[in-house]
Amino acid sequence: MGASCSSCCGGKSRDGLYDNVLADSEREAVADLLQYLENRGETDFFSGEPLRALSTLVYSENIDLQRSASLTFAEITERDVRAVDRDTLEPILFLLQNSDIEVQRAASAALGNLAVNTDNKVLIVQLGGLAPLIRQMMSPNVEVQCNAVGCITNLATHEDNKAKIARSGALGPLTRLAKSRDMRVQRNATGALLNMTHSDENRQQLVNAGAIPVLVQLLSSTDVDVQYYCTTALSNIAVDANNRRKLAQTEPRLVQSLVNLMDSSSPKVQCQAALALRNLASDEKYQLEIVRASGLGPLLRLLQSSYLPLILSAVACIRNISIHPMNESPIIEAGFLKPLVDLLGSTDNEEIQCHAISTLRNLAASSDRNKALVLEAGAVQKCKQLVLEVPVTVQSEMTAAIAVLALSDELKTNLLELGVFEVLIPLTKSPSIEVQGNSAAALGNLSSKVGDYSVFIHNWNEPSDGIHGYLSRFLASGDATFQHIAIWTLLQLLESEDKKLIGLIGKSNDIVDMIRQIANRQIESDNELEDDDEGEVVSLAQRCLELLGQGNAKAHIEG
């Protein structure tokens, strides 16, 4: 990521190279080095005699020799980057501490080039490279600043280095240089700050160093790379609840800036802006603020793009925004329903499907009107078409959405006519506990106040052992929640006053026997909440027996 700002890597002419009188060893090293440079394509400067010649120049007291050494290191590392040992790195680190600007500039360029290699990243830090780089970041020379920051940017991509950099005192200078007037310095500094946002501890160090206001300010940069680095860094910072609170208190322009960036000409910036808003929208305040900042329009455009990362970031964001009840109607009115339904079938991306159906469920949560609009948009038809084929995580979301829609008395007949039993009943046999529970909850919601119970009769034994099989399995499961769902559903069916349906239940000896066992269950628990839940299940079972004309069974309830 870090870009070198060094452009001067040339050597000096042979004639009149040095005015000062050189030691014999230095004169010999210069002659050798010039010869090696003439055959640079075939010379390994990182070992043996070439490295010894370079090192002689490095440790000379002659500034011209030191400059030549640093420029040579910068040149050879520009075209030959590989893992090197301390014998190569120590001379370069020694040059970094030189007071001469030209030496500093070339040495930091060389080190930045070598810091592209994974092994070198670790060794540079182990050999104490951070301290001189931090000093160079505070240099008045822009080229030196640029190379030093670029090197730290590269070093910060290695996990082993991040915490060391965070504790080294580098974050303050990096934050200041992020405001540099030189775009190269700014890019390198914001890139380095981004690399420091991948762990909780480092993010906190970054916040403490005062990076947040700088990153927010730079969202309005005209440079796409700076926009991307700052947007991504803020997205990572917003993962933490404490940081979101800090952002809410101190950065009133943040949301509007991110909303504006969703209309950037750069897809990577658009994507990160939506993801940053997604992370912010973990909090209620931001869920509302994004809508108020006219964020729905740009999100809808991203949602309808053909670029998968944009779709994913937008649908993840709208999912979080849709959690707030006050946002349900604005999202629906903005035209999201049909595109969300279309996403369910237009991609096999599991994450996109999960976010899309979860959003539809959220939009249906608070009002029967919105439930009807979700149904009209074709959500249930699409779920029915796909639910038996999609991954388990998507099945769980789809069945949960149907269960929510089934809470509306006005929609129950529509749902039954759409044939949801064809998928809900088989899914009560799913290997997933969540899918089983959601499917059973949907069946339970549909069993209450339907009016016409003929579909329950028709599906009593089919498909997949029908309603009968589902009730029998759940009653026998030993799971208190599953038993509760099954008994509550049974009670709705028995209260339907549909004689044929009640007759089918009464003839199902397995079901009746299990209801009787539950009705006679003794409650022995030290937990009052468990007592209440268990007591309700027993009470429902007793009520079922009464409606079956077998209400003389004695139940023994303690407590």
From Swiss-Prot:
* UniProt xrefs under InterPro entries: ARM-like (IPR011989), ARM-type_fold (IPR016024), Armadillo (IPR000225), Vac8 (IPR045156)
Q: Which GO terms describe its molecular function?
A: identical protein binding; protein-membrane adaptor activity
Which residue stretches, if any, does this entry annotate as coiled coil? none
- Keyword Protein transport: yes or no? no
The way it spans or sits in the membrane comes to: Lipid-anchor
Placement of ARM repeats on the sequence: 77-116, 118-157, 159-198, 200-239, 243-282, 284-323, 325-365, 409-448
Query: Could you name the domain of life of the organism this protein comes from?
Result: Eukaryota
Q: Which SUPFAM superfamilies match?
A: ARM repeat
Q: Where is the lipid attached (S-palmitoyl cysteine)?
A: 5
**What GO cellular-component annotations does this UniProt entry give?**
fungal-type vacuole membrane; membrane raft; Myo2p-Vac17p-Vac8p transport complex; nuclear membrane; nucleus-vacuole junction; phagophore assembly site
Q: Which UniProt keywords apply?
A: Lipoprotein, Membrane, Myristate, Palmitate, Repeat, Vacuole
Write out the N-myristoyl glycine lipidation residues: 2
Instruction: List the subcellular locations.
Output: Vacuole membrane
Where does the UniProt annotation place the signal sequence? none
Q: What role does this protein play?
A: Functions in both vacuole inheritance and protein targeting from the cytoplasm to vacuole.
**Into which family does the record put it?**
Belongs to the beta-catenin family.
Q: Which PANTHER family match?
A: VACUOLAR PROTEIN 8
| Name this protein carries in UniProt | Vacuolar protein 8
* Gene giving rise to this polypeptide: vac8
